[in-house]
Amino acid sequence: MMNRKKKIVIVGGGLAGLALAMKFCERDGEVTVLSYQSLKRSHSVCAQGGINAAIDAKNEGDTPEKHFYDTIKGGDFLAHQPLVRDMCHQAPAIIHLMDRMGVAFNRTGEGHLDFRRFGGTLYSRTAFAGATTGQQLVYALDEQVRRHVHDGAARTLEWHEYLGAVLDSEGICRGAVIHDLRTGDIYTLPADAVVLASGGPSQVYARSTASFVSTGAAATTAYLQGAKYANGEFIQIHPTAIPGQDKLRLMSESARGEGGRVWVPRNANDKRDPKKIPESERYYFLEEKYPLFKNLVPRDVASREIYDIVYNQKLGVNGEPMVYLDLTHKSREFLDNRLGGIMDIYSKFTGVDPRESPMKIFPAVHYSMGGLWTDYGPDSNGLIDHGSPRNQMTSIQGLFAAGEADYQFHGANRLGANSLLSCIYTGLMMARGIMNYTDSLEKSVDDISSTTFDDTRSHWQNRFTDIKAMNGSENPYKLHQDLGNIMLANVLIVRDNKSLEKAWHAIHDIETRFKDVKCLDTNDWANPTPSFINQLYCMIHLSKIITKGALMRDEFRGSHYKPAFDMNQPKDFDPHEYIDYLEQRQYGEVPEGKFPRDHLDYMKRFQENNEKWLKTTVAQHKDNEPEITYEEVNTSLVTPRPRKYD
């Protein structure tokens, strides 16, 4: 290879992309950071509540190993354990790094970092900067990247869209095709590697907490070019958002972490002002059903319980699909200091002061545990080799993924405040591996014929010319709304195969209608319509991945809840019984009377279910449809067992 600096293209200016850009430049590489909008408006800024690390500042006995266990348990054991363990052990150093960069984390009266509790753990391990943690982290990393821009090692291309990878004759990624959203120009960027840190796919649903640019188009394009997509069916539904007709605005888990209580009137016909309803007539259903974790059960659990209260028990506030999230027992000073950001959001969009009256909330589409399939390289002990070129590489050589665009860290359900951690961790961790990958290439990008880049650019120019020529009767924005409503109605909190089959056929109807779309604006300059039509095409394919994965996975795991396959854990069951059961099985038959009969029956069914379904769902694009296969999950460190939070 030529003796020059290695250069990579990073698609996405959120935490994963910025962390990687900083670290790659520190290794004397060159980066181009591509962003659909201003870097400081990347979707990572929307994360409110905090970032996890087991620093144990409050002397509760927390450790990185406990953080690791809580994370894999929260994800229903569907994540590769060596990766998760390494992330949790690196977390304290990441917090201290961000602190040194100037992130304005909240502090105790003594000046130490302050921590709050989040869902799925009994420890205070979430560092936070009021209720704007994501924004503060992005701004700190953005400053570091801008320093490298000043030094000439990095450049940023804001208001540019990633269209696809440039693949050579061997299928190796050699660069990116990008679209200038202002001029309409399409051109290529040669690179030794391309990294997709492009965020999640929440716009597949009609309403969500996510930014309107969270279409998943970049990851879906990779899938259409041959990359594997993993665990698409696992969509996180956040339990607390402001109901709305346009989008759903997040009320951070930090509200419950700071003492917020979820309740409804015990009497479904009680129309009184919530402040006038006495404690005895309030149903704190999470606290009653889960006395250990109370309002801080994991998000999948809380969302299912709220859904049950509203739709099965018919106890929604004033007969509507919402429950109360109550912080009125906290002082205004306390709320403004620790939750000021979300207090202001709720006041602005509802006209009600949450310091004085309980908030009305309901679950909302929030995050995707699934994403592009990515690899990792183990060391001699079966843990993570930070220098492995395989780390975070997709099934397309030279194309990597990080952050919400990849699937590796959260299993079937993400714990709150682990998303910011996984983004920064992957960005920092993968830089060394990418540098080693570029060193290992037998052929440099400089040796690739210019025809490869010209042909790829021409393909996309023709694609956009064809889009602009579309002159049918379908409005693409209305078609997107119809697609999103199909997903909301059929592929949400509670799933059944009949509804999923209905969604599957309806999505194909949308795909047929797409051929009759009309491009409403054919100009080049500052015209978002052709881009949106291309993104809609990607969202149709992504909705097929999500729906088919959900349809084929006949079990209940994490956020994927099919009541027909709920194994109904006995109420007095202790998960440690399952470990004893497995040990007994190793030595032959389980002695008669060792376990209660209903417990034994449950454990047998649980083991059989895990043997079949404790696997990663892998989708590959074949004949215009997702072909689904399954891969084993690395569970070498902790034996998977039933989850229990009460």
Placement of each model-derived feature along the sequence:
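Glycine-rich Rossmann-fold phosphate-binding loop(s) that bind the pyrophosphate
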Residues: G12-L15
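An anion/pyrophosphate-binding glycine-rich loop and adjacent beta-alpha core
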Residues: T221, A227-S357, G433-N436
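Short beta-strand "acidic-cap" motif of Rossmann-like dinucleotide-binding folds
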Residues: G29-S35, N231
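Conserved redox-cofactor binding core of oxidoreductases
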Residues: D99-D185, P190, A197, A241-R249
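Glycine-rich loop(s) and the adjacent beta-strand/alpha-helix scaffold that form part
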Residues: A193-R249, V317, H410-G433
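FAD-site-proximal beta/loop scaffold in flavoenzymes
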Residues: G164-T188, V352, E356-F409
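Glycine- and aromatic-enriched mobile tails/lids
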Residues: M2-K7, L20-K23, G29, S38-K40, ...
